[in-house]
Amino acid sequence: MAGIAATPWGTDHAWMDLVTVPPRPATLVEALKESRRALEPPPPDPSGARDGSRLDALRRSLRSHKVTGMVVPRADAHQGEFVASNAERLAWLTGFTGSAGVAVVTPRCAALFVDGRYTLQAAEQVNTGLWDIVPLAHTSVNDWLAKTLARGDKLGYDPWLHTVSEVDRRNRVCEKAGAQCVPLPVNPIDTLWQNRPPPPLGPVIPHPDMLAGWSSADKRQRIARDLRDAGATAMVITDPASLAWLLNIRGADVPFTPLPLGFGILHGDGAVDLFMDGRKLPRPVLAQLGPDITLRAPSALADALDTLGGQRRRVLLDADACAQWVRDRLSRAGASVRLGADPIALPKARKTPAELEGARAAHVRDGAALVRFLCWLDQEGPRGTQTEMSAVATLHALRAEAQQFRGPSFETISGAGPNGAIVHYRVTPETDRRIEPDMLYLVDSGAQYRDGTTDVTRTVPIGTPTREQIRRFTQVLKGHIALATVTFPRGTTGSHLDTLARVALWADGVDFEHGTGHGVGSYLGVHEGPQRISRRPSSVALDPGMIVSNEPGYYKTGAFGIRIENLVAVAPVTEPPAGAEIPLLRFETLTLAPIDRRLIDVAALTVAERTWLDAYHARVLREIGPLVDDDTRAWLAQATAPLAPETADGTGPEATPPAVPSASS
């Protein structure tokens, strides 16, 4: 039960199937919930991080391991975006709770590396008298090490927490400095961390073939064929998302993403050895997996890798995702290690027709909840009675009314006024800001449903927006529409299209620093690769079925933030222009929610841009209107009305917000 208590909530009653047999009387259900609450591990006490006692203890431990320093990433053995509570080693050591960061500890200094999202948060949470906060935009971890390491230094690391490619790059840095990278047999933090939460025991559930569109047996045969074509006879699967997709299962071991933590070995005949705690798999799931899936304890992975080595097997590993520990074990055992891309990644990214249908249904459902929220916000925002946190709670409650809802797909970004300018802002009780007139409010949120994953951002004026806010919002909208309406040939990558989202902003000499689009899974990760839309070069083409986000923005530090985000699916152009000589692709917009007309300078839009927005809004009203109450439908009709000609001063289509139902309605 302690392992169950270490998993996120939001898995309905599936976890109860691991400890009791249905049907369950209401009294038993409540007793189980109380037992789980009592066993939930408390968050790490930050006092030991702030007073330096943990840092001192780690340095003493490193001396006993005969190393002079250590790299501590926010990572687990699976290299995922979200980690279980027992893997929050960076937070335990430093007090920093952001979703990405790396610490380096040496006898002389301690540095915490964070990206631009977390510079302010790190400075607030970490004792800067003990730790140097290093922005990754200025100095990479390896560049810092190259300047800091001395000849003869031994830099320790946990080989479970670093990928093969990371270790290769770091080894080169150490060799150049005359130092060594030393894999540690045990992570010292695991020994020092008192009351560390147990490994999570989230229930594994089947993901029906009707939602996946492809049976696990067919998937395994397809990937096994690709494996053989690549000259390998087996592959080690360390990414839980790849494992979940391949076996048509989902889990509940980490926040926000329905992942079952475990490892797999796929053999050339399509059989899989699954290394996962058997307590997580109810009997119906075991039966669904079938005879070609052999369930083994996680502790058996080492022996299984030794067996592959003893058989001199050719084993494929993804160098960018696989832990160095796996390569070390295979190499020592005599296996021939082949490094290459995960062959599951692209098939997983190319959604089946069934997955696309699920995504469309999920977005209609999500759109209804979001429209109800935006209507509520239009009523409550000007009153100044709501805060960023109360808005998050309201939106969550509206989504949770859907039977298929399984929880948020990430922690909601609820940014009022200047907080909206922090790209990945996370509200806390200490930062919670009141939503009130004369500010912009940015809300970036998403949900997990049994049939799809959503991610959407809307920016709303509370009161009357300024001319500057209208200009910037309109520029962001023009970039959004440019990407939404583009047609492109097969083989086009996201880096080819990224410029479209930025040109209107560039005209004024401004830009946004984040990527324009990320891939999204099917009841899996809200951030999924390998596809993306970004300035960073990419060799991965945007293929039919891929889902990506379209989210240009603008951020004025200390003032406001703007982002417009829809999810889109890559689809063939079914009616190409006359004389077209090559097959073309387009984007199908999935997200359904109004884009605030009060922030649009209609005079700055082209006829084509106005036509697109009017058509999009008509679709939102058509598909969402029947799903909401009469008052919300009336509000939605105004929020999606065709754009009126620009006003005399060119400030936008209307000066007043849509009518909002009264509090009594």
Each language-model region and where it sits:
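Active-site neighborhoods and metal-handling regions in enzymes and metal-associated proteins
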Residues: 2-665
